[in-house]
A protein has these predicted regions:
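Radical SAM enzyme [4Fe-4S]-AdoMet core and its adjacent flexible, acidic
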Residues: 1-63, 68, 73, 77, ...
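Flexible mid-to-C-terminal extensions adjoining Fe-S/redox cofactors in radical SAM and related proteins
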Residues: 72-185
């Protein structure tokens, strides 16, 4: 997956935006017959998405992450909070507020934790859609699929450090109630 401009990285200008990501993947994949020369563990439709041939929405709930702090929400790249249980993650996260075109932090994201699940769902719903890619490889030239409009996304909120500081304070004082049993629910 492409590098993602997460808020804690000190060097923000070297992360790829969506257009540069698509161009880079097209250049790389064109050297390997659209990826046919290499074994990838990602789905064909996800690779096709990275090359700009699919327009996908993020599904961050498709790859949830459990940490020592609890279940990270909405995804492990944003880390905008933690909850104790999987049920609380799934039912208490306002999923509609996240994703490309919805949240400024997500504007350039094309990472597997948000889009591989979308590509897998697309492959299940449209099983023949992968066949041309399997036979000929990922298309590396021609027009790209339209991208998602960013004009109505909400501004970024920088909250990660606050969440970590709070949890570390709880751990130091022995007041942390995050347990394996609670997290597994």
């Amino acid at each position: 997956s492409p590098g993602y401009a997460y808020e804690r990285a000190p060097d923000q200008q070297h992360f790829l935006n969506r257009e540069r990501t698509k161009t880079m993947f097209r250049e790389i994949l064109s050297r390997g017959r659209g990826g046919k020369n290499w074994d990838f563990t990602n789905s064909t439709l996800f690779m096709d998405f990275l090359a700009g041939n699919q327009t996908y929405e993020c599904t961050p709930w498709s790859m949830p992450l459990l940490t020592v702090f609890g279940w990270q929400k909405p995804c492990y790249l944003l880390g905008e909070g933690y909850v104790k249980t999987f049920k609380e993650l799934m039912e208490g996260t306002e999923w509609e507020k996240y994703g490309v075109g919805k949240y400024e932090k997500c504007a350039n994201c094309m990472v597997h934790c948000g889009f591989e699940g979308t590509a897998a769902t697309d492959a299940i719903r449209h099983p023949l859609k992968s066949v041309p890619i399997l036979l000929r490889g990922v298309k590396t030239d021609g027009p790209m699929a339209p991208d998602i409009d960013l004009s109505r996304q909400r501004p970024a909120e920088f909250v990660f450090s606050r969440h970590v500081e709070k949890k570390m304070s709880e751990i130091r004082t022995g007041k942390s109630d995050t347990t394996e049993a609670a997290a597994a629910e």
